[in-house]
Amino acid sequence: MNIFLTGVTVLVLTASSAVQAHDTESYEHVVATPIEINEQSATNVGQEYRYPSGEPVLLAYRIVVKPGQKTSWHKHSVPLFAYIMSGALEIDYGSKGIKKFKKGMGFVEAIDWCHQGLGVGDEDAVILGLYLAENSPDSAKPVICDGPQ
């Protein structure tokens, strides 16, 4: 029995190492490639975040920012995971600096921190936004700010 368990452990560890080395997992001929997330346990400006206390709801949006287009200064009151599907985006966080994101990058957006997005490059910045919101009207809607913090 011990030899069997040792063999299983070696196989599991070997398979685990192979998965980590290739950063993809295969299950029933379906390949799942992890999406790199900048600062997984904090927002991209270093804030800890918590899920909303009310009834949870996951909301998904396809957001498009044209080249040269600026968003208004705004902030989010709930956690938002953003994934850049195409193009590039520059976000001004005022005293926290400017961060650039391009196709294939993911991040947890700042919470209750005023910021402004700018579409950069020659193509639309297309973002998949997943809001971990509350099941209440406008819980995922950005709040307009006067300017940078």
Task: Please identify what each model-predicted range represents.
Residues 6-16:
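Bacterial N-terminal signal peptides
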Residues 18-57, 143-149:
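A short, N-terminal "cap"/entry segment at the start of jelly-roll beta-barrel domains
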Residues 53-57, 68-81:
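A short beta-loop-beta micro-motif enriched in histidine and acidic residues
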Residues 65, 95-112:
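Short acidic-glycine-tyrosine-enriched beta hairpin
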Residues 71-76, 93, 118-120:
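Short histidine-centered beta-strand/loop micro-motifs
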Residues 112-138:
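Ligand-binding loop in jelly-roll beta-barrel domains
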